[in-house]
């Protein structure tokens, strides 16, 4: 009987100490912060399967552009590029927006101030240094179009 009790005690001890939760919780990084675009990829595929994908690497001037996501669901997009008769790096557009971000589904909706258009995107990657946003154009059901932006975090 003592052997049976020892075996039971040993198995119980093994059951309590032998199991370990191997799943590490997914780390959640904030969308809030200031982001610098580094490149974009434009993809287009027709219903016949013909298509292309172009990668556009931004210039140093274009990398000075900023997408700012504030905690109160507002933001600002500032685009910079070479402009003028003697091209200098200048702000070519600046737009305020509001946004709704669902981190569990990774959906992001951006509405620019003064418009009724809502741009819908998917957060493909979001970590402490990098974010990829994919915008899909569904206006033509026979052609798939998407633009994926890659950003580098400037600040949080």
Residue spans for each PLM region:
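Lipid interaction determinants
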Residues: 20-96, 100-156
């Amino acid at each position: 009987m003592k052997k049976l009790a020892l075996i039971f005690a040993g198995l119980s001890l093994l059951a309590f100490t032998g199991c370990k939760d191997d799943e590490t919780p997914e780390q959640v990084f904030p969308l809030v912060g200031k982001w610098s675009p580094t490149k974009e990829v434009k993809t287009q595929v027709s219903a016949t399967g013909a298509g292309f994908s172009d990668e556009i690497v931004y210039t140093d001037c274009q990398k000075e552009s900023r997408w700012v996501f504030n905690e109160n669901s507002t933001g600002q997009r500032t685009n910079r590029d070479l402009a003028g008769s003697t091209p200098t790096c200048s702000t070519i557009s600046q737009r305020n927006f509001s946004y709704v971000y669902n981190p569990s589904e990774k959906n992001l909706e951006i509405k620019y101030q003064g418009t009724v258009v809502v741009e819908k995107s998917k957060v493909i990657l979001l970590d402490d240094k990098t974010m990829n946003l994919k915008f899909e154009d569904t206006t033509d059901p026979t052609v798939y179009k998407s633009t994926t932006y890659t950003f580098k975090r400037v600040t949080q």
